[in-house]
Amino acid sequence: MADPTGISLAFGDDTLEPNPVWTRIDDPSVLPGVRVAGYQIDRGRASETTRTEGGSATVTITDRDGALDPTNPTGPFTTPTNKIQPLVQAAICRWNPVDLVWDTRFRGWVAEYDYTFDPSQQVNQLQLTLVDIFEILATVEMYPGGDFGDPPPAGSEGQVYYGAPATVDQANYRIERILTDARLGTLAGTVFTSAFAVVFSLNVNVWPATYSPGETALAAIQETVDAELPEIANAFTDRFGRLAVHGRQAKFNPGGVLAGPPPIDNTVWDWHHWYVGDGDFVNLNPAAHAQIRQFAFNHGRQYLANSAMAYPVSVTDATMNGQVYPAAGTATPSKTKYGIRSWSAPNLITAQGRYLSGGVTTVTDALTETHRFAQYKVANYGLPVDRITTIGFRPLLPADPRAGAVHRLLGKADISDQVDVTVPSPGGGGFNGAVFFIEGIHETCTGRLRGGVAAGAEGYDDVTLTLDVSPGPVDTSMFTPPP
């Protein structure tokens, strides 16, 4: 089926139809009385230290003819197979006036239609509230009886159980199992196929896990992701509306993950490395550097951690002390300077770490692997760093030599992309190619622009894009393959 364009809904398709038929509702040649006044998109998380939550979007519409009014008996969307109703698929796409392509910015489902009658009764105001795949997964409760998991061992009857006693699963396989049980994909052997999820670059094996009846599929997935490396491994919704599950190497070495083995193509992960900065930086290479329009940063104590502990569910009282890093009683410059700033990751289902080197996979045990999580935390958060709190972008006229870079960023920037920032400040400070990664995305559109666009051609969104970003890791040496 054709990809969505503009603001599109899939009126006639089921909620989980993998190839929906899209109707663009802001196309005046299709629905001349419908005008989109604007939209707001919010996805991701504020920083890497919080768990990613579901994304949402709102679309504000003026409906002069009642085309999108479900009480209109003669409207175009009233038949049983082509009807205005909740949980139809929805997409928000942005036109790139330089490259002349549509870029999907949000894909999900209509949660709510909210109608406000104008006092003149000549027009309706409609607000669409959209949700993403997290909402779908959060409403899938896991029940015993065969739909979810494996036959439970003795003593766990009545629970939902994944795994087999005394065995381990690869983390990506566990997540694919859960998604398959939730009817969001299929597994043929070890080959997972889904229109709604992509899972890759996980580097650990996980213990069997037991869930109480009523726990959600989303909670089980997030627990498995945390086994890879809490905070750094991530499950989020990408701009195509898919649940994207990335392991730690997707941040440590994105180029290596893309290269493989196995290689990852851009239909699975449309990763970009952006170069952004002030006007002087953009003028060095207008075709490749995108101009920042809003910028602020913080240098504070919030993310400091100089004493950490991470341990698996298999830990014992006798081995617990060994999971602290640095070891108890060890003095460090950070502790001396700032006092103890603690972080912990308890009861992880991590069973083994997997390391591929020279075509050979070696494994670490659960205690060793989770201890590395504590090492990573202290190595990368033991000192305060400069964190960007505001970074924003705006469109330019299509003929501007700087327009191509910024319109590509406006259309294709996504969670997990790398952003190198160059913004000098008075006195010689500032940022010079500082590496950050996108954690969250916020987009506010207040209408359409036609500057520099020929009569009858597609306009482009009057949009402000702001990003939540995290600093790139400083030290990942603890995750090198064992000798």
Question: What does each model-identified segment do?
Answer:
Residues 1-18, 28, 36, 42, ...:
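Surface-exposed cap/loop segments at beta↔alpha junctions
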Residues 1-15, 19, 23, 90, ...:
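Short polybasic amphipathic segments
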Residues 7-9, 23, 30-39, 47, ...:
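Generic structural motif
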Residues 21, 94, 101, 108, ...:
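Residues in intrinsically disordered, low-complexity segments of regulatory proteins
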Residues 44-78, 200-238, 275-483:
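An acidic/polar, Gly/Ser/Thr-rich interaction patch typically located in mid-to-C-terminal regions
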Residues 90, 95, 240-243, 342, ...:
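Positively charged, low-complexity intrinsically disordered regions
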Residues 98-102, 119-301:
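Charged- and aromatic-enriched interaction segments used to assemble
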